[in-house]
Amino acid sequence: MSGLTIFSDEQPEQPLWQSRDAEEIQQQLTAIGVRFERWQADRELGENPQPDAVIAAYQHEIDRLVAEKGYQSWDVISMRPDNEQREVLREKFLSEHTHGEDEVRFFVEGAGLFCLHLNSKIYQILCEKNDLLSVPADTPHWFDMGSKPNFTAIRVFDNPEGWVARFTGDKIADSYPRLD
């Protein structure tokens, strides 16, 4: 089940607010300019689906985002617990960073933890199957896929080259709870 935990950016040991209610999560995130919606990831894709099959199954949803926001490209990221690069890839995005464009993810299966650093608070968003999250450009954040990642998500871009991580150098992410 999706979840949101809000912390002060000075007190990682004490949550200020928590919820697993999608409507409450959406209200909290909308207030800070972050899009969170529950979509239906109900297509049968089989085990270890190929990216083209995932795109084809959810083309209608992708087209909706493209029509709304003018995004120009999309792809699929899939991570499994047996991926030999899982530790390197996890570590890469566990440090606070920004992107020059929105970070849009639709979770088709599995889960991941997005942590946003806004307004002197940390917003930890547990995204699971059916969750659409759009983090605005230039928002300081980090992502934890867990020690045994198991997810498939559609990523939507303005420009894939613009999606380069710009690390802030802030070690704040080291102080907050991880996915596992």
UniProtKB/Swiss-Prot annotation:
Which cofactors does this gene product need?
Fe(2+); Ni(2+)
Please state what class of enzyme this protein is.
oxidoreductase
Protein's pathway: Amino-acid biosynthesis; L-methionine biosynthesis via salvage pathway; L-methionine from S-methyl-5-thio-alpha-D-ribose 1-phosphate: step 5/6
Q: What InterPro entries does the record point to?
A: ARD, ARD_bac, RmlC-like_jellyroll, RmlC_Cupin_sf
Cofactor comment: Binds 1 Fe(2+) cation per monomer.
Quaternary structure per UniProt?
Monomer.
Record function comment: Catalyzes 2 different reactions between oxygen and the acireductone 1,2-dihydroxy-3-keto-5-methylthiopentene (DHK-MTPene) depending upon the metal bound in the active site. Fe-containing acireductone dioxygenase (Fe-ARD) produces formate and 2-keto-4-methylthiobutyrate (KMTB), the alpha-ketoacid precursor of methionine in the methionine recycle pathway. Ni-containing acireductone dioxygenase (Ni-ARD) produces methylthiopropionate, carbon monoxide and formate, and does not lie on the methionine recycle pathway.
Name of the protein this chain belongs to: Acireductone dioxygenase
Q: Which organism is it from?
A: Yersinia enterocolitica serotype O:8 / biotype 1B (strain NCTC 13174 / 8081)
